Amino acid sequence: MIEKGGSEWEDIYVDAFSGDIKSEPRPHDEGFFGVLVHIHEGLLMERAGQVIVGFTGVFAIFIAVSGFLLYRNFWRNLLRLRFSRLTTFASDAHKAIGVFCAPILIAVSVSGAWWDLRFLFTPPPQNLAPQKIDDNLSIDALVKKAQENFPGFNLHYIGLFPHGDAAITLFGYKADQNFLHNEYSSRIVFDGSGNLKQIKDISEADFTERLLSSFRKAHFGNYNEATKFLWFLAGLAPLFLGISGFYLWMKRSNFKRRKA
């Protein structure tokens, strides 16, 4: 949940059967891994950090694409690893790892850059008057109504964001939707009285919405367990590529100086 007027997500535990509150609100991202998340998203610098990380993603896209183009005949020696000299091995490994990981790194960089820089291209949300939610409104009844009006809809999470005509939004997915879309790419909106206001089926959305809906899985590799592991390995690749690339650059610079 987010405190009214705030921007930070917090967690609170509630007994699903009795409705009793079992904990105090606590930051959603806390501890060591929470700090890592904030560093990853914005270097702990709010908007300025987002801009830096976003343009770093743009730079990473350029590096991945240009490297792929420079080594466009990669299929000739893709699996060749020569161990005769360290420089030769570093060059072969740099090219092979770069080619294998380039598609994943491009997908990760494009989605990450968009998330960090989208505030530059999208208008700020309107400050609409909040809408009161009927105290007697049944969430179970809304879920049932949603599934009746949107056959095949599977609920993923419920958003209580009262503003304008929208008060309760059910986020989910269709069982037969494209595997590229995430688990809450479709949504059903109700007003504070439980009246159905909108059904947003991602399969009927325009190209831009469908593209943006595919970013989450493309960024995290959440297609299946095997792809998660592949994305993990690809995430380690920039470390090796940076070290090997710097080493090769140093060797070439020294060679040119000696030749001069």
Predicted stretch roles:
Residues 1-260:
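Conserved histidines in hydrophobic membrane contexts and catalytic metal-binding motifs
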